[in-house]
Structures are given as C-alpha cells and as structure tokens.
C-alpha cells in the first residue's frame, strides 16, 4: 500500500512539474537589451513624479513636524 501511495504522489508531483514547465514555456520573452532600454525609458519619463528623486514639498509632507519642540 505504501509503495502505491508513493507512486501516486510521484505521478501527481510530475504532473504539477510538467504543468509548471508548460506555463513557463508559454511566457513571451524579450531580449535583456530591449528590457533594459524600456526600463530606462520608463524611469526617465516618470522621474519628475518620483518623490525619492524630486523630494516632497514641505507643505505636502505629512511626516514633517508642524511645530518645534518647546523643551529645548
């Protein structure tokens, strides 16, 4: 009985592996040079909206202290 269960598990695992490989084989692929050029273009187009590059205006910064510390 144990041998039959192990065999069934192996078959199920093999089917899952084949299904995964078929899915991965159907994915459209592009060359790294094209992907990197597209990524650089996207970054350049959206750089003006990136708060890490442009900074956040102090009037819109929700984390900036509204008042100074009175203890010091």
From Swiss-Prot:
GO terms for cellular component: heterotrimeric G-protein complex
Protein name: Guanine nucleotide-binding protein G(I)/G(S)/G(O) subunit gamma-12
Subunit structure, interactors included: G proteins are composed of 3 units, alpha, beta and gamma.
Modified residues (Cysteine methyl ester): 69
Any one GO biological process: G protein-coupled receptor signaling pathway
PANTHER family to which the protein is assigned, alphabetical: GUANINE NUCLEOTIDE-BINDING PROTEIN GAMMA SUBUNIT
Keywords, comma-separated and alphabetical: Acetylation, Cell membrane, Lipoprotein, Membrane, Methylation, Phosphoprotein, Prenylation, Transducer
Family: Belongs to the G protein gamma family.
InterPro entries linked: G-protein_gamma-like_dom, GGL_sf, Gprotein-gamma
GO terms, molecular function: G-protein beta-subunit binding; PDZ domain binding
Membrane topology: Lipid-anchor
Entries under Pfam families matching the protein: G-gamma (PF00631)
Tissue spec: Present in all tissues tested.
Function of the protein: Guanine nucleotide-binding proteins (G proteins) are involved as a modulator or transducer in various transmembrane signaling systems. The beta and gamma chains are required for the GTPase activity, for replacement of GDP by GTP, and for G protein-effector interaction.
Phosphoserine modified-residue sites: 3, 26
Lipidation residue positions, type S-geranylgeranyl cysteine: 69
Lineage, uppermost ranks: Eukaryota, Metazoa, Chordata, Craniata, Vertebrata
Reported modifications of this chain: It is not sure whether phosphorylation by PKC is on Ser-2 or Ser-3.
